[in-house]
């Protein structure tokens, strides 16, 4: 069952704290901003946010006044993320889901000056488990995950 508004705010604050830890552990990692990972038909993959992550995305989309109307027709088969702006940047970058934060794209580059090194898998796995647990507290009947494209299709 979904919690009260105060509980939801606390759980969302916990989610943002997990995101901050993930971002810190990935400090220095970059990508070339090709937006390949934001075009699910190109990579054949897409993030599956949990219920609590979806609530955070909804909050961020509401805060910016909704999603913009697309000015151009989508490229067939591209399956572009609804959160990708026409400028190639995420419209809700600070609230992007865990999957978007953790460089699931092969284009990720390790921090400059450190040579090639692996992503911190233990920290990523721990954070993933914490988000799943948090989502179960947030919405025990339907904690997720769900395909991001299906979630945003109704926005």
Predicted features, each with a name:
Residues 1-155:
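Short loop/turn segments that flank or connect secondary-structure elements
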């Amino acid at each position: 069952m979904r919690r009260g508004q105060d509980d939801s705010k606390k759980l969302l604050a916990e989610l943002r704290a997990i995101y901050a830890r993930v971002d810190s552990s990935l400090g220095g990692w970059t990508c070339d901003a090709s937006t390949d990972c934001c075009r699910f038909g190109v990579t054949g993959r897409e993030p599956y946010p949990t219920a609590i992550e979806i609530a955070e995305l909804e909050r961020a989309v509401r805060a910016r006044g909704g999603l913009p109307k697309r000015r151009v027709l989508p490229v067939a088969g591209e399956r572009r993320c609804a959160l990708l702006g026409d400028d190639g940047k995420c419209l809700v970058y600070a609230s992007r889901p865990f999957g978007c934060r953790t460089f699931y794209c092969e284009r990720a580059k390790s921090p400059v000056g450190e040579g090639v090194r692996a992503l911190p898998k233990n920290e990523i796995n721990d954070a993933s488990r914490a988000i799943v647990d948090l989502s179960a507290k947030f919405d025990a009947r339907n904690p997720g995950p769900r395909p991001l494209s299906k979630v945003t299709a109704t926005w």
